[in-house]
Design a protein with these regions (language model features):
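Amphipathic alpha-helical assembly/interaction segments
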Residues: 1-87
């Protein structure tokens, strides 16, 4: 399947859904977490889609792969923050 924009990528679309769900979820967090866990969750989830978009804009395949790896790391960071929230 050919695509023109990063918005066409299924992985970016799923990352966007995750990011939006996180934005809704953190609204229920205690106010004392606003600048701690809430901020970390928002930043790491934004990084997932940001890295995918940036990688899409790179010209070389190794650069694209590198940004996918970074996005995966941001996704793992987001999962870790969710686990912290449960604890």
């Amino acid at each position: 399947m050919a695509y023109q924009n990063f918005e066409d990528l299924e992985v970016w679309k799923k990352g966007r859904v995750l990011k939006n769900e996180i934005f809704e979820t953190v609204k229920s967090f205690p106010s004392e977490e606003k600048f701690r866990l809430t901020d970390q969750l928002i930043r790491s989830s934004r990084s997932v889609t940001t890295q995918i978009a940036e990688g899409h804009g790179r010209r070389t395949f190794p650069d694209r792969i590198r940004f996918c790896i970074i996005a995966r790391g941001s996704l793992s960071e987001t999962l870790n923050h969710f686990l912290d929230a449960v604890d």
